[in-house]
Design a protein with these regions (language model features):
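Catalytic alpha/beta active-site cores
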Residues: 1-182
Length: 182
């Protein structure tokens, strides 16, 4: 009783009901592990017709090329859905450059495209105990490569590994905030 937060509307402090004032729509995302770009594209087109409006492709770094991206995204309208990608942390800049090149070739309005390229340096260190390259240099190159995609998120914090390792929710949140601060 007496809590003012129960009267808060979306878009109002303390943002308990989200930040969207006009609607509270969320993306429905499907993750696809890409074994072959043709099969992943067929699966993506099938699930897009079933209501999914966000795709997440886990691509193999060794196979990245302009043809690979073109085959993977064939007949998918990048302006109509959210596209998310993850690959080996050492190849995220290459992936970003290939995506920007593909989007420019298809004459998309780059300011309208939404999505992400998963670069989470700390998660790799936590999960594998290995550092892969220079974090600052890679992050800078990735941000520069995606500068023309203002609605693409490229620096991520994936705290799920902590949860899977047995962390409580408050520990997971605390570490995630600390990583974000780093």
């Amino acid at each position: 009783e007496g809590l003012k937060t129960t009267d808060a509307l979306p878009g109002e402090f303390p943002y308990l009901r989200g930040t969207k004032k006009n609607n509270n729509e969320w993306f429905v995302r499907q993750e696809i592990k890409v074994e072959s770009p043709e099969a992943a594209n067929a699966k993506a087109l099938d699930i897009l017709n079933k209501g999914v409006d966000s795709l997440s492709f886990h691509v193999k770094a060794k196979e990245l090329s302009a043809e690979y991206i073109e085959t993977l995204l064939k007949d998918i309208c990048a302006e109509c859905i959210e596209l998310n990608f993850s690959t080996c942390q050492g190849h995220v800049v290459e992936l970003a450059q290939l995506l920007v090149g593909y989007f420019q070739k298809k004459d998309y309005d780059l300011t309208k495209l939404q999505g992400s390229i998963n670069y989470d340096y700390f998660n790799k260190m936590l999960a594998k105990g290995k550092e892969k390259g220079d974090m600052v240099a890679t992050a800078k190159a990735l941000i520069e490569a995606t500068a023309m995609l203002p609605k693409y998120r490229v620096l991520n914090v994936n705290a799920l590994t902590l949860n899977n390792a047995g962390a409580y929710i408050y520990q997971e949140l605390g570490y995630a905030l600390a990583w974000g601060n780093e």
